[in-house]
């Protein structure tokens, strides 16, 4: 599956979850899925809990986050030592 095909699984609609990106056909936000992964859930566990999801949906969330970060500019923070 191409990146473009994966990203088609993510939609944004101001009327759904206040416009946050969601997996198409669900009310599951990309943010929520990434939070589950960040806290140790495996894709298989997420799919077991939300049986309408697929591996491709999980991959789409990760890819969406990656693409969102690609064009951002980050500024290093100055850290003072004591």
Where are these predicted regions, by residue range?
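Long, charge-rich, low-complexity alpha-helical segments
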Residues: 29-82
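N-terminal first-folded block
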Residues: 1-27
